[in-house]
C-alpha cells in the first residue's frame, strides 16, 4: 500500500531515496479510493527515525494508507525538533472522536521504569480504552506489548536481569494463521528489551493465540482470535544500524553493554551490520494491514461506533 502522508513530512524524501512508494496528500486526492486510516502512537525518543522505519513497512501493498501521527507526552523532546512535532503530530484531544482502521503503538525505552512512574501512563491507558471502540485492529510493539498486557489483562511487569539485544531466531507455531502467512518456518528478528514475555505466561493468563516464539521460549508474535489486537515483542521495523546505535550509545554512557547477539559480522562491533530480518518485517506488516485491518474494517468507519455522527 502506498502510504499517504503530508507533502512536507521529512520521511517523504527519505523513503523515496530508497524507492519506497510514498503518495503525498496532493496526489492521493485524485484517486477515488477510501484509504485505510492508520494512526501511529510514537513513543520512541527519536521520532523521525521511528517514523521512517514504520512508514517503510506500511508502504508495500496496493491500497492507500492515510497516516496520522499521535503524541501523548507534552514534555519538551530532547531528540525531535518542536517544529516537527507541531507540524506533523496531533494530540489525543484532536482525534478522540474519530474512528481508525488501525493503530500502531511503538516501543519505548522504559523497560526498567515501573508503569506508574511513566510520565504519560494515564494517557496510555486512555488511548487503549479508546481504541476498543474506535479502532478496528491495534498492533503493539515491544514495550507497548508489556504495557498493553498490564492494562488489558492485568499481567504484572516482567523484567529480565540483563537486556535482550540482538538478532534472534524464531519459529512459527501456526503456519496457516493469517498473520504468519508466507513466513518461513524459522526467521530472524531483532530484539532490544528488558521486558520478559515467557510464552507460558501468555498461555496461562490470556486467551491470546501465540503464533511465533523465540528459540528460548519467549512469545514473539501473538494475537486475539477476533484480530482486534496483535502483539510483536521484537523490533522488526529496525534499520540495519539501529542496534549498533543503541550499543555504542550505551558504551559511551559507561554501561558496559553486551555486544548484540548474532548482529555484527564475526561479533566485531567494527564490522558493518546487515539487516537479515527485512523480508520478515515487510511480510508481517503487510499481513497485519491486509488480514487484520483491510479485510475486517467497515467501509464506513462511522459503523464501527454507532454513537458517533
Curated annotation (Swiss-Prot):
The lineage of its organism: Bacteria, Pseudomonadati, Pseudomonadota, Gammaproteobacteria, Enterobacterales. It catalyses: L-homoserine + succinyl-CoA = O-succinyl-L-homoserine + CoA. Keywords: Acyltransferase, Amino-acid biosynthesis, Cytoplasm, Methionine biosynthesis, Transferase. It comes from the Bacteria. This is Homoserine O-succinyltransferase. Disulfide bonds: none annotated. It is found in: Cytoplasm. Transfers a succinyl group from succinyl-CoA to L-homoserine, forming succinyl-L-homoserine.
Amino acid at each position: 500500500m502506498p502510504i499517504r502522508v503530508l507533502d512536507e513530512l521529512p520521511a517523504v524524501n527519505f523513503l523515496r531515496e530508497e524507492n519506497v512508494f510514498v503518495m503525498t496528500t496532493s496526489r492521493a486526492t485524485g484517486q477515488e479510493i477510501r484509504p485505510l486510516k492508520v494512526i501511529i502512537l510514537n513513543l520512541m525518543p527519536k521520532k523521525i527515525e521511528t517514523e521512517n522505519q514504520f512508514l517503510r513497512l506500511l508502504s508495500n501493498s496496493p491500497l492507500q494508507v492515510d497516516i496520522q501521527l499521535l503524541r501523548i507526552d507534552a514534555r519538551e523532546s530532547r531528540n525531535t525538533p518542536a517544529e516537527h512535532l507541531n507540524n506533523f503530530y496531533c494530540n489525543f484531544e484532536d482525534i478522540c472522536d474519530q474512528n481508525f482502521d488501525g493503530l500502531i503503538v511503538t516501543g519505548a525505552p522504559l523497560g526498567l521504569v515501573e508503569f506508574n512512574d511513566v510520565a504519560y501512563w494515564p494517557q496510555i491507558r486512555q488511548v487503549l480504552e479508546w481504541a476498543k471502540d474506535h479502532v478496528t485492529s491495534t498492533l503493539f510493539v515491544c514495550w507497548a506489548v508489556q504495557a498493553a498486557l498490564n492494562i488489558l489483562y492485568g499481567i504484572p511487569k516482567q523484567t529480565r536481569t540483563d537486556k535482550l539485544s540482538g538478532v534472534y531466531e524464531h519459529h512459527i507455531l501456526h503456519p496457516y494463521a493469517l498473520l504468519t502467512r508466507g513466513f518461513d518456518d524459522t526467521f530472524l528478528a531483532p530484539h532490544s528489551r528488558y521486558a520478559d514475555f515467557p510464552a507460558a505466561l501468555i498461555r496461562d493468563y490470556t486467551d491470546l493465540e501465540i503464533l511465533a516464539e523465540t528459540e528460548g521460549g519467549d512469545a514473539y508474535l501473538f494475537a486475539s482470535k477476533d484480530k482486534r489486537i496483535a502483539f510483536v515483542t521484537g523490533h522488526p521495523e529496525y534499520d540495519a544500524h539501529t542496534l549498533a546505535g543503541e550499543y555504542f550509545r550505551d558504551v559511551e554512557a559507561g554501561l558496559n553493554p553486551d555486544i548484540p547477539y548474532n548482529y555484527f559480522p564475526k561479533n566485531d562491533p567494527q564490522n558493518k551490520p546487515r539487516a537479515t530480518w527485512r523480508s520478515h518485517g515487510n511480510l508481517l506488516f503487510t499481513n497485519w494491514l491486509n488480514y487484520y485491518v483491510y479485510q475486517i474494517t467497515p467501509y464506513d468507519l462511522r459503523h464501527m461506533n454507532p454513537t458517533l455522527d
